[in-house]
Amino acid sequence: MVSAQLHFLCLLTLYLTGAYGQEGKFSGPLKPMTFSIFEGQEPSQIIFQFKANPPAVTFELTGETDGIFKIEKDGLLYHTRVLDRETRAVHHLQLAALDSQGAIVDGPVPIIIEVKDINDNRPTFLQTKYEGSVRQNSRPGKPFMYVNATDLDDPATPNGQLFYQIVIQLPKINNVMYFQIDNKTGAISLTPEGSQVLDPIKNPYYNLVVSVKDMGGQNENSFSDTTSVDITVRENIWKAPEPVEIRENLTDPHPIKITQVQWNDPGAHYSLINKEKLPQFPFSIDQEGNIYVTQPLDREEKDSHVFFATAKDENGKPLAYPLEIRVKVIDINDNPPTCLSQVTVFEVQENEVLGSSIGIFAAHDMDEANNINSILKYRLVDQTPKVPSDELFLIDEYGGKVQLGKRSLKKQDSPQYNLTVEVSDIDFKTLCSLQVNVIDINDQIPIFERSDYGSKTLSEDTAIGSTILIIQATDDDEPFTGSSKILYKIVQGDTEGRLEVVTDPMTNTGYVKIRKPLDFETEPVTSIVFKAENPEPLVNGIEYNASSFASFELTVTDVNEVPVFPQQIFQANVSEDTAIGTKVGTVTARDPEGLTVSYSLKDNKRGWLKIDSVTGDIFSTAPLDRETESVYRVQVVATEVGGSSLSSTAYFHLVLMDVNDNPPRLAKDYTGLFFCHPLSAPGSLIFEATDDDQQSVRRPKFTFALGRESLQSDWEVSKINGTHARLSTKHTRFEEQVYDIPILINDGGQPPMEGIVSLSVTFCQCVDGSCFRPAGNQVGIPTVGMAVGILLTTFLVIGIILAVVFIRMRKDKVEDPQSPENKPLRS
């Protein structure tokens, strides 16, 4: 008995402290209300019970009842038939309270019944068969036809969201799809493979079977329908013309038509793209596709031009890939020959025989090479002095080779001859100067001061450019001529070209330097042989002998070198949705000493990657996110296994390619939006959307809609452009309060992402154009005094109840003499 009373006490306490005074969920006073009911539910279900206040005794229901909605005298609102959203999605009713005389004493108030959708309709194609055509080489992804289906279910719910898919392509060659369909719009276009392969000569006809499913195609219980699509492949006349040839420096009036392009259908808008970014682009195109050169061209300035012709629709969107236009500028003879230097100097020994070659004289012509306009002819037109006779020299008419023409020269006759050479092409002539110096005969060979320069030991990390040895040879021929000048060559031992000898022209001293890194592993000991020789040939009977050769031994010591990477930066490109555990790249290094190399990662701050220590293969270990880091950079450390454990580093850059995985959101914080109450006219405000995915060259194209259908009678969202939209009121009958308006934003990506954002709009009294909120108690929020009063009242009621319970318990004890508490204690 006591436990039952305590249980009742607890329930009563909870009721008093927790639920007293709250309005019921399924009943309440007469006021405007909105109810949501799923279609297809069994009839005669109670929706709500309205309570009438005297003198009201009954209710009257009017409006769009359609004979479905009824109300009893006691205020029970119910429906008598199954609701069908496709017949009527929203029922607007009026409910009034009547007195016993049938007069309205309260209301009428609006009652809105929203019929919620269920998936009870199958999507249906508008046609059982579609026909379309596409040009070969059309731009992939550009729609050339659409298939359309309808579904009577609510398009704002998954029930009415359609998903298109190509299920069969005939013929399907090599299992390659040539066509693709936009899953949401039904737009059919070519795949990249189809753009390249389709040929009306090989296969002019294709058939597709296309299906459409509701529930976004994501539910196994979704309904579907199919249709047939016949596609004809037509020839594409949007082709690049043959390369054009234009003679330079044309004097005809410009512009001059040089070629033409043509789109497959009328109405295209043509333009040219200056691919090479020339400051003055000398070409233009008209709207017939005719391409013109607008000014004379200069081949010596630019011998060819490459640019693109594009065709766009009336909205400025490309109809296909641009065509490459190639123009070759044909040479004319508009440049005279030029001398390579003010004076060309040759040397000849005084004992040279008749016909000996002195040198090759050359000039230059800026006209096109290997063309008649640039073929040069040489002729000697003057000699100074003419001693011992004129015409001592000959020159090859086309080769420019200068030879002795009559006899050997003597320095005592003249140490120098000045020749004038006429250089000509088919139209122009130029005079150039040639100086021939007569030098002593080369009858002395260079002689090394030492034949053996000993040996030297160097570490393999000796710096490039270091001088490791100085060698010296002498020549007794005439100083500062080609007969006495010494050139040093390494004729034995340096097969890899790691060394070089640089000669001082004043002293003929040779400096042996390191040209490439030394390598102990391939050449630990090298025997080097040097040769000293003259640029001028030796006279007959004189030959280089052992005096012109010297030797040197180079020993290279080992240096424990770090592992070597073939490159300092390794890069791989992967999609950001790459699965965990996927191999994303490989890094390799080689140890010069042949030791095994172990790999590890450094600066792997996000822990996205791991590396196989043996192979250098790199794998993903966590979800990748381009919005967090578009290029993830880590260091790869290669360490010797054994030895001195030396290490080296390289960089691995993982470039993350974007997938559409971020829903749209508001571009900034839109708190503080308000309208002055009351509205004198419908108002509007503008907001901007963005998302965190990588944006293409074209700006994003978001679509906007209200997040709830019930808001459509009060609000409207209209798109301004791809990123901005306008939220507008549809009337002025708003209460002075805060409205939270959900906005549905779709990015139209692949796959599409949707986000629901909320705009809080306040309707308030305004002072000087700003929202005015007077200080004071707000309706519905209790004051401190009210809270204290409620607590005191609650505790008072609890105290009374406790007192009643304990009195009752005491009374029960008195009435029960067998109770242990009523028996006297025994001593």
Swiss-Prot record:
It comes from the Eukaryota. GO terms for molecular function: beta-catenin binding; cadherin binding; calcium ion binding; integrin binding; proton-dependent oligopeptide secondary active transmembrane transporter activity. Its main location: membrane. Residues 1-21 form the signal peptide. GO terms for cellular component: adherens junction; basolateral plasma membrane; catenin complex; cell surface; plasma membrane. One of its GO terms (biological process) is adherens junction organization. Glycans are attached at N148, N183, N249, N418, N545, N573, N721. It is a single-pass type I membrane protein. InterPro entries: Cadherin (IPR039808), Cadherin-like_dom (IPR002126), Cadherin-like_sf (IPR015919), Cadherin_CS (IPR020894). It is found in: Cell membrane. The chain crosses the membrane at residues 787-807. Gene3D superfamilies: Cadherins. Liver and intestine. Keywords: Calcium, Cell adhesion, Cell membrane, Glycoprotein, Membrane, Metal-binding, Repeat, Signal, Transmembrane, Transmembrane helix. Residues 29-127, 128-243, 244-339, 340-448, 449-565, 566-666, 667-776 form the Cadherin domain. Residues 22-786 are extracellular. Residues 808-827 are cytoplasmic. PANTHER family: CADHERIN-17, CADHERIN-23. Cadherins are calcium-dependent cell adhesion proteins. They preferentially interact with themselves in a homophilic manner in connecting cells; cadherins may thus contribute to the sorting of heterogeneous cell types. LI-cadherin may have a role in the morphological organization of liver and intestine. Three calcium ions are usually bound at the interface of each cadherin domain and rigidify the connections, imparting a strong curvature to the full-length ectodomain. This is Cadherin-17. It comes from Rattus norvegicus (Rat).
